[in-house]
């Protein structure tokens, strides 16, 4: 098992705007510049929180965003989106149950990442920095 965090923050350390928006992210870097496609091609599983999933829903077709991975959303709500499974509980315990032969991408957010970091379960942090200043927002590390 290998657990990765791959994401982008602003120059002032935020991974999302104050209202959890990611508009700033969509305006920076192409897939070629960020090596996103290469990274994603090696992943088996994505993990994300509800707010990250809500941003993905705004695309209109969330299943097309992560079409080749098993996708889990930590939430206490039901999901009606094909290709995504709602889960709850401790992210570290959940990851332990996924199996050894998996490449797991923690898409976001910090409430999913922090417990995994606390238990030294993250094998690789890939943090890209966008030339953007938000002034306030949701930090990657709290």
Regions found by a protein language model. Give the residues of each.
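Enzymes that bind and transform nitrogen-containing heteroaromatic metabolites
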Residues: 1-142
């Amino acid at each position: 098992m290998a657990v990765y965090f791959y994401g982008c923050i602003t120059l002032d350390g935020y991974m999302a705007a104050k209202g959890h928006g990611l508009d700033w992210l969509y305006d920076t870097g192409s897939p070629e510049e960020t090596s996103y496609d290469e990274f994603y091609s090696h992943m088996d599983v994505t993990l994300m929180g509800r707010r990250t999933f809500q941003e993905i829903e705004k695309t209109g077709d969330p299943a097309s965003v992560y079409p080749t991975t098993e996708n889990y959303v930590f939430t206490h709500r039901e999901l009606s989106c094909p290709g995504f499974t709602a889960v709850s509980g401790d992210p570290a315990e959940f990851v332990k149950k996924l199996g050894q032969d998996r490449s797991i991408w923690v898409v976001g957010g910090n409430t999913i990442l922090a417990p995994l970091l606390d238990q030294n379960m993250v094998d690789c942090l890939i943090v890209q920095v966008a030339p953007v200043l938000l002034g306030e927002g949701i930090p990657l590390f709290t």
